[in-house]
Amino acid sequence: MNATKFVVLLVISVLCAIVTARHVEEVSKETKLGTSLPKSTTKGIGAQLSAAGITSSSSDVYSSATGFNNPKGPDANAYENGYTSTSGQVIAKGRKARVSSASASTAKGDAKAAVTRKAAAARANGKVASASRVKGSSEKKKGKGKKGKGKKD
């Protein structure tokens, strides 16, 4: 490294040290805004209001029935399996955000098999149902008190 590069790097580091060493002064919200507002008003300034809800449900059913006549004699198999899954996620920001979510699912299966030496019969069926609901808001409730009374905007 030659002397010119060394001096340039030295000057840059001194400037960086001066910039980072400056005292940061705390400024109130009223000063930043250039107004004098009540404390209750400034608490809500810059607040993010949002409400989001996600919910899902799924159902799955598997039913199987077999009946057969083999050389060793008649045989019957019946199998059923039901699966349900529900999940939900709620995200709310802000003092007035409200979210509710609900999900439900059901799965029902039925399998039957019957065999005689001369005949075989099998039946399988399944039913599934899923439902999801999400409701949310980030607005203030309007109209406290009796209807028709209060301030008009």
Curated annotation (Swiss-Prot):
Stretches the record annotates as Disordered: 63-82, 122-153
Taxonomic superkingdom: Eukaryota
Compositionally skewed regions (Basic residues) per UniProt: 141-153
Signal peptide interval: 1-21
Any single GO BP term: mucilage biosynthetic process
Keywords (A to Z) from UniProt: Signal
Biased composition (Low complexity): 122-132
Family affiliation: Belongs to the UPF0540 family.
This protein's name: UPF0540 protein At1g62220
Taxonomic source organism: Arabidopsis thaliana (Mouse-ear cress)
Origin organism lineage: Eukaryota, Viridiplantae, Streptophyta, Embryophyta, Tracheophyta
